């Protein structure tokens, strides 16, 4: 009996592990399905330029504090590939009963469809950025100091216009293309007639995978427009640019052919070039600023040229979602025309972006 009992105990002891090993493993817990974003996703930001300007030559010592830009950027992702932007801006009225007042106006209001072709491509419809100025301002961060060269000389009527455009990167990082059709009057004016402006920019990055040479780009821009029938409004720009954490340089040349006057329809040829350089500690920290513009407003007229020199520097604070710049410059404008008084001004400015 004792033997039978011991044998039974041994059989039970051996059977328990075997039984445990043959138990099926519990089913793995299913991974939760990622939650879909709840559209629309709305982000609100601000871009503002504040300044103090003091005239020091031929302007009777005029000086003033001012707000030269105040954007409220409202960006909405309506669906996975659908976006909308609305940006009101503040401008100073210079005529009428409200002359001198700051008033609100619409700067941008457009819809955008993403990834129409190559990844990173998009199409826009409405009041949005034209191909050149927004691109140049992405390289030269000193829009707070003043307008870019072509806009300052009146060849591009503002950075935004009513129209439709398409943007696409080139394969393997070799550049990008942006082109569209616009009213041609800029965002401050309504369409004057049936004629439109066709604008296109091609930017080539010849060495996308070559270290420091990655920062080199060559860009070309062309605007084919009309004031009216037989009154062209053409502009061509070629620019080389180099971007590095410690140095940004651009050199551009432009030519324009225009017939602005309806009463005296004479074709005017204009040309000029501009150099911009910013040696800096990096995106954050101290930076120097040098810009030289030379522009001839009418090649057929003597003494129609003017030169602008901007020199100074700034200090930049850059965070993941915000940027503050403190900028001080001296701007001198020299006119070849003897009857045109030269200009010189000191500018103290602040750039706020968040």
Give each language-model segment a name.
Residues 30-187, 192-199, 203-212, 276-289, ...:
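Outer membrane beta-barrel
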Residues 4, 22-24, 32, 44, ...:
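Positively charged, low-complexity intrinsically disordered regions
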Residues 20-22, 30, 35, 50, ...:
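Intrinsically disordered, low-complexity regions enriched in polar/acidic and amide residues
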Residues 23-25, 33, 38, 168, ...:
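Compositionally biased, intrinsically disordered low-complexity segments enriched
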Residues 49, 56-60, 79, 85, ...:
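Outer-membrane beta-barrel pore domains
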Residues 1-31:
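Cleavable N-terminal export/targeting peptides
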């Amino acid at each position: 009996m004792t033997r039978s009992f011991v044998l039974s105990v041994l059989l039970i002891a051996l059977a328990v592990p075997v039984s445990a090993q043959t138990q099926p493993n519990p089913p793995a817990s299913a991974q939760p399905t990622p939650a879909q974003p709840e559209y629309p996703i709305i982000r609100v930001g601000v871009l503002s330029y504040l300044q103090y300007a003091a005239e020091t030559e031929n302007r009777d010592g005029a000086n003033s504090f001012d707000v030269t830009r105040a954007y409220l950027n409202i960006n909405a992702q309506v669906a996975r590939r659908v976006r909308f932007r609305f940006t009101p801006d503040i401008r100073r009225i210079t005529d009428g009963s409200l002359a001198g007042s700051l008033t609100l106006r619409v700067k941008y209001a457009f819809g955008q469809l993403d990834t129409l072709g190559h990844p990173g491509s998009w199409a826009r419809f409405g009041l949005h950025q034209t191909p050149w100025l927004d691109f140049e301002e992405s390289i030269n961060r000193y829009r707070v100091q003043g307008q870019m060269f072509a806009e300052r000389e009146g060849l591009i009527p503002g950075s935004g216009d009513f129209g439709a455009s398409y943007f696409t990167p080139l394969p393997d990082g070799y550049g990008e293309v942006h082109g569209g059709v616009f009213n041609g009057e800029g965002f401050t004016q309504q369409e004057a007639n049936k004629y439109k402006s066709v604008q296109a920019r091609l930017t080539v990055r010849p060495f996308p995978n070559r270290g420091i040479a990655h920062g080199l780009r060559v860009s070309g821009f062309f605007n084919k427009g009309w004031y009216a029938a037989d009154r062209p409004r053409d502009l061509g720009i070629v620019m080389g640019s180099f971007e590095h954490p410690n140095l940004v340089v651009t050199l551009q040349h432009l030519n324009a052919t225009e017939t602005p006057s309806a009463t005296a329809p004479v074709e005017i040829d204009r040309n000029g070039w501009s150099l911009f350089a910013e040696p800096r500690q990096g995106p954050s920290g101290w930076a120097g600023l040098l810009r030289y513009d030379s522009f001839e407003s009418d090649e057929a007229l003597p003494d129609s040229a003017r030169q602008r020199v901007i020199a100074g520097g700034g200090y930049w604070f850059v965070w993941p979602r915000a940027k503050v710049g403190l900028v001080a410059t001296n701007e001198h404008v020299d006119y070849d025309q003897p009857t045109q008084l030269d200009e010189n001004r000191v500018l103290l400015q602040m750039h706020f972006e968040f």
